[in-house]
C-alpha cells in the first residue's frame, strides 16, 4: 500500500480547462484512510483537499481553491497511482468542477523530493 503522508507533488500535465500548472505544488497528508492536503502556485492562490484512500491506493477527494482572479472554485477528483522504478508516485487524475460550467478533464501530478 502507498502511504501518501508527507509526499509533495507538482503538476506535469493538465487538460485545457484545468487551472493546475507546472507551478502548482501539492502537499499531501494521510491519517489512516483519510487524505488531506494543501496546494498553491501558478493560477491557484490557495487550495485545500480532503478525501479517502481506497484499498487499491486510488484517491477520491473534493477540492476547493481560490484562483488568481479571486474566484472560489470547487470540484471532485479520482486519482490513480503509478509507481515509478525510482519509487516516486505519479497520479493520473480525472476531475470535474462542481461550479459554473462543470468542466471536466484530466491531469497528471508527479512526486518530487520533499
Region annotations inferred by a language model:
Residues 3-4, 28-35, 53-57, 83-88, ...:
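Short, solvent-exposed coil/turn segments at beta-strand boundaries
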Residues 20-24, 44-49, 72-78, 90, ...:
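Short, surface-exposed coil-to-beta transition loops
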Residues 40-46, 65-68, 94-101:
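Short, solvent-exposed aromatic-acidic interface loops
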Residues 10-11, 35-38, 59-63, 89-94:
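Short hydrophobic/aromatic-rich beta-strand segments that constitute the beta-sheet cores
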Residues 23-25, 53, 96-114:
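Edge beta-strand at a domain terminus
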Residues 24-52:
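N-terminal glycine/threonine-rich, aromatic-flanked beta-hairpin/loop signature
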Residues 53-89:
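Mid-chain, well-packed structural core segment of small domains
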Residues 1-20, 91-97:
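Tryptophan-anchored aromatic micro-motifs
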Amino acid at each position: 500500500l502507498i502511504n501518501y503522508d508527507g509526499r509533495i507533488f507538482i503538476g506535469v500535465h493538465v487538460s485545457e480547462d484545468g487551472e493546475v500548472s507546472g507551478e502548482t505544488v501539492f502537499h499531501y497528508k494521510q491519517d489512516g484512510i483519510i487524505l488531506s492536503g494543501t496546494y498553491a502556485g501558478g493560477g491557484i492562490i490557495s487550495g485545500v483537499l480532503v478525501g479517502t484512500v481506497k484499498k487499491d491506493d486510488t484517491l477520491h477527494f473534493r477540492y476547493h481553491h481560490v484562483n488568481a482572479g479571486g474566484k472560489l472554485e470547487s470540484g471532485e477528483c479520482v486519482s490513480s497511482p503509478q509507481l515509478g522504478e525510482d519509487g516516486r508516485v505519479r497520479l493520473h487524475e480525472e476531475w470535474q468542477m462542481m461550479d459554473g460550467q462543470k468542466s471536466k478533464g484530466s491531469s497528471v501530478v508527479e512526486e518530487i523530493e520533499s
